[in-house]
Amino acid sequence: MQRLTIRDFLKKKGKEKITMLTVYDYSMAKILSETEVDGFLVGDSLGMNVLGFPSTLQVTMDHMIHHTRAVVRASPRQLIVVDMPFMSYEPSNEVAVKNAGILASEGADAVKLEGGVEVYERVANIVKFGVPVMGHIGLTPQRYLTLGGYRTVKDEAKLISDALALEEAGAFSIVIENVYAEIAKKITEKVSIPTICIGAGPHCDGQVLVIHDLLGMGDIQPYFSRKYLDLKAEIREAVKRYINDVKTGTFPGRENYKSRES
């Protein structure tokens, strides 16, 4: 099965909605690789959803490398984009290029950076050295402290300026997070590269959701997500039945073990 490419994403602009899911591990990526979803984002949100950190700020390159390897091994078809974690690109162009190259060598088809005008040089240098970049504007979780928390971003002029700067720097796509739908629509119309929304309305070229939110596995259900399954409840019920079967002696059943008499 042929993996989707950057060119495939670009061709979908304004024609076919792009679907992406944030995924972190081999077993989940293996299941999802058998669907028609277009791309996987190995997100630094693994800090909260997998590692139990309070935010994305504690996530390191080692964490991202580990989870990138797992997802890559499971995914023959989907385009794989990997978040560059906090302080893996901010210090200098050289640091940014080096770390982007490491993620690419582990199988990432592209990397994602948070920020707009302020990361122009980082994006341009990473692209120049051969690693595709997806931008990320609006609510940028790595900068939530300076934003005063996880708030809807309303500065239309800055958002448009950020999007245009990312496109000029060579980004092939832009994630727009937690922005008014009308602003996301304007950005989508102004740039020639695909926009991917999360909490920014229906007018982008595509959507991305965290698989934990889609399956109802998280502690908090974000307003912008849709829970397609209450997997947390189903897991609890399955474990409850297992415990009951063990205590009542109905597990293991005769079909679950071997004996000399069989």
From Swiss-Prot:
Keywords, in A-Z order: Coenzyme A biosynthesis, Cytoplasm, Magnesium, Metal-binding, Transferase
Cofactor(s) recorded in Swiss-Prot or TrEMBL: Mg(2+)
Alphabetical list of Pfam families matching this protein: Pantoate_transf (PF02548)
MF terms in GO: 3-methyl-2-oxobutanoate hydroxymethyltransferase activity; magnesium ion binding
Cofactor mode of binding and number, as noted: Binds 1 Mg(2+) ion per subunit.
Domain of life, source organism: Archaea
GO CC term, one of those recorded: cytoplasm
Subcellular location: Cytoplasm
Active-site residues (renumbered): E177
Record-linked CDD domains: KPHMT-like (cd06557)
Positions bound to 3-methyl-2-oxobutanoate: D44, S45, D83, K112
GO biological process: coenzyme A biosynthetic process; pantothenate biosynthetic process
InterPro entries: Pantoate_hydroxy_MeTrfase (IPR003700), Pyrv/PenolPyrv_kinase-like_dom (IPR015813), Pyrv_kinase-like_dom_sf (IPR040442)
KW Metal-binding (keyword) present: yes
Residues that span the membrane, as ranges: none
The EC number(s) this enzyme carries: 2.1.2.11
Catalytically driven reaction(s): 3-methyl-2-oxobutanoate + (6R)-5,10-methylene-5,6,7,8-tetrahydrofolate + H2O = 2-dehydropantoate + (6S)-5,6,7,8-tetrahydrofolate
Record: residues binding Mg(2+): D44, D83, E114
Similarity-based family: Belongs to the PanB family.
Function: Catalyzes the reversible reaction in which hydroxymethyl group from 5,10-methylenetetrahydrofolate is transferred onto alpha-ketoisovalerate to form ketopantoate.
Summary of subunit composition and partner proteins: Homodecamer; pentamer of dimers.
The protein's name: 3-methyl-2-oxobutanoate hydroxymethyltransferase
Gene symbol of the encoding locus: panB
